[in-house]
Amino acid sequence: MGSANNEYEFLSEIGLTSHNLGSYVAGKWQANGPLVSTLNPANNQPIAQVVEASLEDYEQGLKACEEAAKIWMQVTAPKRGDIVRQIGDALRSKLDYLGRLLSLEMGKILAEGIGEVQEVIDMCDFAVGLSRQLNGSVIPSERPNHMMLEMWNPLGIVGVITAFNFPCAVLGWNACIALVCGNCVVWKGAPTTPLITIAMTKLVAEVLEKNNLPGAIFTAMCGGAEIGEAIAKDTRIPLVSFTGSSRVGSMVQQTVNARSGKTLLELSGNNAIIVMDDADIQLAARSVLFAAVGTAGQRCTTCRRLLLHESVYDKVLEQLLTSYKQVKIGNPLEKGTLLGPLHTPESKKNFEKGIEVIKSQGGKILTGGKAVEGEGNFVEPTIIEISADAAVVKEELFAPVLYVLKFKSFGEAVAINNSVPQGLSSSIFTRNPENIFRWIGPLGSDCGIVNVNIPTNGAEIGGAFGGEKATGGGREAGSDSWKQYMRRSTCTINYGNELPLAQGINFG
């Protein structure tokens, strides 16, 4: 694989070689796009080569997907659930290999890589149960001998465009639900994590083949903006789920809206943790460490802003600075590493540029603030003391950079939390019930995820995941998110011989 490095030998266990076709369309592997190399962010050396999909591959795949949709939507929901159960079992059988690949190709530490694959397995389990609970309402009719009810039917095809930071979890949030709801899936993985796209798809394809189902039910393509743009423009895809930057997400939304399609957007986050004067300081400090340093600050739910009550400011900061100095930076596959590399050399450059902007706006670096010299994309975990009014605080720097802000009252803290354009995740540390219920109430956090005494990141799959404002407003994963993947029809049935009209209208 890319080198004689023993580190890569396990890839053959999940169907990968030194040269891979990056397009699974019409039930077969083919690819006629450009040849790219996927790189190990720990050293920027090639892991393997991938041939990306072309627009011709895309069109062939969508035609087959259209035909497969006619078959898949007629399979009973519990049977579709059984297929998703088998996909979960297939992932379980390769959990460690897939987790290792994710760590190798994306750069997150091994525990997080395995945890991400486990999240997809959990989504499969959730979807299996859901397949017997796609319930519609039965509604009393005001007219005699009439019945009203809701029917939920598949949309047909769901497009899923995922990002590098969670190259398979976000697929799981969408695809597991879309499949049990009777939709085919067209997946475009991130261009910098093609191997995880291929490895995941191979397992899904094996399950479909074993059950004599069309492979086109799950169509996957490695590629860049050209393929993503095709998905956004395609009227055959009624729903497009996009995870990525606000800039690209806005373009996707405009393109899909122009054809009257629907979008699920999971864009940027600028998440805050509030530590009140009555908080458990140790619990808060441990939570902030994971929230700010985990995945090298490349989660959409990473804690970017730490709001400390003036009475506990010094104490919390002292604990955090001690913890930060003990963070092991290094190869994400090595035991004990807590901070792996940023995903690309460009990410490392953006970190360095961001630090200069922060300094120019009055930011005081308390620890970190430097890129680590060497061949990988490593940077130091960074804590910065800064004013809440600094313009840079309103932006998302996708790196382990934590802004520390001081406040005097609960109301001031909530105002700072809500002062940014994004509205994904938030958390407060307090023992006071009044603070808790004000925080989760209508005048509290304006985010889609509102936590108490836990980090901003690490969401469970049972709840709906998503945010408000510039984050996009979509909801994926658990709860009743499934309704976004189906078409709702209100049906009124007359089983009598008369024709009474609603609202008592007499017409002729």
Swiss-Prot record:
Pfam families tied to this protein: Aldedh
Transition state stabilizer (site feature) positions: 165
Keyword NAD: yes
Gene Ontology molecular function: aldehyde dehydrogenase (NAD+) activity
Enzyme class: oxidoreductase
Reactions catalysed: an aldehyde + NAD(+) + H2O = a carboxylate + NADH + 2 H(+)
Residues involved in NAD(+) binding: 244-249
The enzyme's E.C. designation: 1.2.1.3
Gene3D superfamilies: Aldehyde Dehydrogenase, Chain A, domain 1 (3.40.605.10), Aldehyde Dehydrogenase, Chain A, domain 2 (3.40.309.10)
UniProt KW Disulfide bond keyword: no
Record InterPro entries: Ald_DH/histidinol_DH (IPR016161), Ald_DH_C (IPR016163), Ald_DH_CS_GLU (IPR029510), Ald_DH_N (IPR016162), Aldehyde_DH_dom (IPR015590), ALDH7A1-like (IPR044638)
Biological process according to GO: aldehyde metabolic process; response to abscisic acid; response to desiccation; response to salt stress
Keyword list, A-Z: NAD, Oxidoreductase, Stress response
Active-site residue numbers: 266, 300
Residue intervals passing through the bilayer: none
Assembly behavior: Homotetramer.
Name of this protein: Aldehyde dehydrogenase family 7 member B4
Biological source species: Arabidopsis thaliana
The encoding gene: ALDH7B4
